[in-house]
Regions:
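Extended, low-charge, aliphatic-rich alpha-helical segments
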Residues: 1-102, 152-306
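Extended lipid/amphipathic-ligand handling interfaces
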Residues: 83, 127-137
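Short, well-ordered strand-loop elements centered on a beta-strand within folded domains, enriched
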Residues: 134-156, 233-236
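Amphipathic hydrophobic-ligand
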Residues: 111-128
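Short, surface-exposed beta-strand-loop junctions and turns on beta-sheet-rich folds
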Residues: 107-109
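Eukaryote-specific, cytoplasm-facing alpha-helical/coiled-coil scaffolding segments in long proteins
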Residues: 125, 130, 302-306
């Protein structure tokens, strides 16, 4: 195992132990990726402009891509419909919930018209939503468990406050707003929880690289994806193995996952870290599969020895 002092000097002291693949993608870039790879989404793009693209090496691989501008179109699935315009105008409709707004740092400041289970309309609803995925510990792994929704919003009522009913509402306005808030929270949490859980359940445990040769990536989440500072973050365990060679599947005898540095997301729209553990498993698998030959010369040996 690598000396800890040297490892901390090379990798930095702020590391996460047990990680193999770690990535951060801002929300706009994530949508662009989904747009290209999801067959249900219209693939018309209004405008794409990419600047300042580079790849640098830092404890594995760090990919930097910044300044992305794009226009998008529509996504629809059964009862859920989300419409995007090139101006970043958004319209969401889920059963009785409709929302309009503009995409800013996240889906902030949405004007909502809610009619389900409530006899009157709500307008001028300013909403700020924070979505967090809770996790549960199973053995030495963290698995997705539930979604917590934090909402902060206010609104006005659309009726005549001079009427008898209007005067009654003034007296009990806070109580009515509390009931409405609870109903909206239940609806949003139910929809988001279902959608995110379905998405996480579709993540494969194995990613096939070459079926004929038996190459696969053994993959599992260390922590479930979560949103922080307008980035979708994920941390996962991964190793490259050959299903036809049992020796490559015995992870405990050769390499140990150690850690990956913390993110440096200033000026970036995405970042990916690959640990030395993943790289070592890939090299070992290629070597055992006779795809890779290792040649040590006398000069290299002397340099390493010195």
């Amino acid at each position: 195992m690598m000396d800890k002092t040297f490892h901390d000097f090379f990798y930095g002291k702020d590391i996460e132990k047990g990680a193999g693949l770690k990535g951060a993608i801002d929300l706009k870039t994530a949508y662009l990726i989904i747009k290209y790879f999801n067959s249900d989404i219209n693939k018309e793009i209004g405008h794409i402009e990419v600047k300042n693209q580079n790849i640098s090496i830092k404890t594995g691989v760090s990919c930097q891509l910044s300044n992305i501008h794009f226009g998008v179109t529509n996504y629809s699935h059964e009862k859920v419909k989300i419409s995007f315009e090139p101006t970043n105008l958004i319209h969401i409709k889920i059963n009785g919930l409709e929302a309009w707004g503009h995409i800013t740092s996240f889906f902030q400041v949405l004007l909502v018209h809610y009619t389900e289970n409530i006899s009157f309309e709500i307008n001028k609803l300013n909403i700020h939503a924070i979505v967090m995925i809770k996790s549960k510990s199973v053995g030495d792994k963290l698995l997705p468990d539930a979604v917590a929704i934090s909402l902060d919003y206010d609104y006005d009522f659309d009726f005549d406050l001079t009427s008898s009913f209007g005067k009654f509402v003034i007296l009990f306005k806070n109580a009515i707003k509390k009931l409405i808030r609870e109903e909206i929270n239940k609806l949003i949490e139910k929809k988001l929880n279902l959608g995110i859980q379905i998405g996480l359940s579709m993540i494969p445990n194995e990613i096939v690289i070459d079926k004929n040769k038996g190459y696969i990536i053994d993959y599992s989440l260390v922590t479930p994806p979560y949103i922080e500072n307008n980035f979708i973050l994920f941390n996962s365990y991964a190793r490259f193995i050959n299903k036809n060679i049992p020796e490559t599947q015995n992870k405990d005898n050769y390499f140990l996952p150690y850690g990956i540095p913390s993110y440096d997301l200033i000026g970036k729209s995405s970042q990916l870290y690959v640990s030395e553990y993943v790289i070592n498993t890939a090299l070992f698998t290629f070597f055992k599969s006779r795809e890779l030959e290792i040649l040590i010369t006398l000069i290299c040996f002397l340099l390493i020895y010195l």
